[in-house]
Amino acid sequence: MIIEYLYSDVTSLYGDNFNIKYLSSCVKNCEVIYTNFNETPYFVDHKVDLIYMGSMMERYQKNVIDQLMPYKEKIKELIEDNTFFLMTGNALEVFGNNIDDIEGLKIFDSSAKRDYSHHHNSCFLGKYDDMRIVGFKSCFSYTTCDKYPFMQVEKGFGFVNGGNEGIKYNNFYGTYLIGPLLILNPNFTEYLLKQMNVEYKLEYQPTVKDAYDIRLKEFESYKDFKEFKH
């Protein structure tokens, strides 16, 4: 299994890199390719099983878009060919039409608007397929997109225009949920690995599932989640 982690030096703002550390620990002989700025992405000339990018400071988003723009058609081709993509935090905004007046890759019909006077922080409980997904959001930007919903919001906040959160198209998974999403949601991690058709052993059992059950029970106990903004 080959994972390409794009621009890991700037796209692990909330510890998102632990998604890849955990995923790679579950699969024998997993190779992680780290692509930095001004390097040709590995996916351009080689087969990869998963392309990953995590949360970043807003000032780096244009740099990331500029780096990926020459490979836009290749990225679209890989998405259509069902290569797996996982984008956490504001990384998903890169693939939309725009972030304010910054032109995005325009792969998905989404638009993000920043509001630096309104830093959103909240817990999240949602549903994908028959799985409950727990997580956390922290962002200055708000996305409008009514196509290809990933998760249905049960408690918390999704996209601006409805009760959905994230983008799911073919094997592209993009969500505003930050940090070690895969550690927090071992059920989704297992689902992802099964979809990728690789041999795996979910690490740190039963601790990760016990922690998930405790967090899920806690989240279910709240009537709703409030937004903390500063």
Stretch-by-stretch model annotation:
Residues 101-166:
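Pocket-forming structural segment of enzyme catalytic cores
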Residues 32-34, 107, 135-137, 172-174:
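Conserved beta-strand scaffold positions in the cores of enzyme catalytic domains, especially
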Residues 56-127:
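Cysteine-nucleophile active-site neighborhood
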Residues 1-77, 183-186, 190-230:
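N-terminal beta1-alpha1 cap of cysteine-dependent amidohydrolase-like domains
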Residues 1, 30, 83, 103, ...:
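A structural micro-motif
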Residues 12-13, 61, 94-97, 114-116, ...:
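Short, well-ordered, mixed-charge alpha-helical segments that flank or form enzyme active sites
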